[in-house]
Swiss-Prot record:
Biological function: This enzyme is involved in nucleotide metabolism: it produces dUMP, the immediate precursor of thymidine nucleotides and it decreases the intracellular concentration of dUTP so that uracil cannot be incorporated into DNA.
InterPro entries linked: dUTPase, dUTPase-like, dUTPase-like_sf, dUTPase_trimeric
Pathway: Pyrimidine metabolism; dUMP biosynthesis; dUMP from dCTP (dUTP route): step 2/2
Superkingdom of source: Bacteria
Organism: Caulobacter vibrioides (strain NA1000 / CB15N)
Source species taxonomy: Bacteria, Pseudomonadati, Pseudomonadota, Alphaproteobacteria, Caulobacterales
Name of the protein described by the UniProt record: Deoxyuridine 5'-triphosphate nucleotidohydrolase
Keyword annotations of the record: Hydrolase, Magnesium, Metal-binding, Nucleotide metabolism
EC identifiers of the protein: 3.6.1.23
Family membership: Belongs to the dUTPase family.
Catalyzed chemical reaction(s): dUTP + H2O = dUMP + diphosphate + H(+)
């Protein structure tokens, strides 16, 4: 496990109406990501039709230290078993965002998928995100690869 800088923590603020949902947490000691759960009413689950997208709320806001981001990533089991994944994977939650964290999901499967209250819908991973100096130049350093892309180095 890599060292976390002293005094830094990820702080979650619970939104009203989700006292029954657990705070995001790591499922195992070695987990890189922590579970994000759906904050939808018990009587109004989200039914995600094949090919459809939705924005699923988590019921939490988050404070991330400057210089870091929270990446919102798919859950592999959801993708494998149901074809449900994060549309903009990885989604980015910036350190200065304080609104509710929502997850953009898409159903790539062939059957309806129902998202119920408390379902684990994605995982959050904290990653360094420094703001690098951005500099315009006339030319870039030459490389062996050059401008070749999209399969130019082999399949």
């Amino acid at each position: 496990m890599s060292a976390i800088p002293a005094g830094l923590a990820i702080r979650f603020k619970r939104w009203e109406g989700n006292a029954d949902l657990p705070v995001p947490a790591y499922a195992t000691v070695g987990a890189a990501g922590f579970d994000l759960r759906a904050h939808v009413p018990d009587d109004a689950p989200i039914v995600l039709k094949p090919g459809a997208r939705c924005m699923a709320p988590t019921g939490f806001s988050v404070a991330i230290p400057d210089g870091y981001e929270m990446q919102v990533r798919p859950r592999s089991g959801l993708a494998l078993k149901n074809g449900v994944t994060v549309v903009n994977a990885p989604g980015t939650v910036d350190s200065d965002y304080r609104g509710q964290v929502c997850v953009l999901l898409i159903n790539l499967g062939e059957e309806d998928f129902t998202i119920r209250r408390g379902d684990r819908i994605a995982q959050g991973v904290i990653a360094a995100a420094p703001q690098w100096p951005l500099v315009e130049v006339e030319d870039l350093d030459a490389t062996e690869r050059g401008a070749g892309g999209f399969g130019s180095t082999g399949v």
